[in-house]
């Protein structure tokens, strides 16, 4: 279910404060955050935000296409080990 328009998008207040300070000073520093649930707002465009994936921080460069999405969408939490080889899967089978 989508968040109510009346409430507006959720953005971690500390993260928003850091982004606004960087916008005022004109700096381009990497901002670390654990707030994967924060919605990307237009103020964040052009910044790099290091989003925590449970193990480490993944740097995510924010573009205009990302506005409205959540930060956590761009930092995967699971490692894909690959599919099993066909040889390994059929090796133990008796025919």
UniProtKB/Swiss-Prot annotation:
Residues 76-95 are annotated as: Disordered. Pfam families: Ribosomal_S19. Keywords: Ribonucleoprotein, Ribosomal protein, RNA-binding, rRNA-binding. GO terms for cellular component: cytoplasm; small ribosomal subunit. One of its GO terms (biological process) is translation. Transmembrane segments: none annotated. HAMAP family: Ribosomal_uS19. This is Small ribosomal subunit protein uS19.
């Amino acid at each position: 279910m989508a968040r109510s328009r009346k409430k507006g998008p959720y953005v971690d207040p500390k993260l928003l404060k850091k982004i606004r300070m960087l916008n005022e000073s004109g700096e381009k520093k990497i901002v670390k955050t654990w707030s994967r649930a924060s919605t990307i707002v237009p103020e964040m465009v052009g910044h790099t935000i290091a989003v925590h994936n449970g193990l480490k921080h993944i740097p995510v460069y924010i573009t205009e296409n990302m506005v409205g999405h959540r930060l956590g969408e761009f930092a995967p939490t699971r490692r894909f080990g690959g599919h099993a080889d066909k040889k390994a899967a059929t090796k133990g089978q008796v025919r």
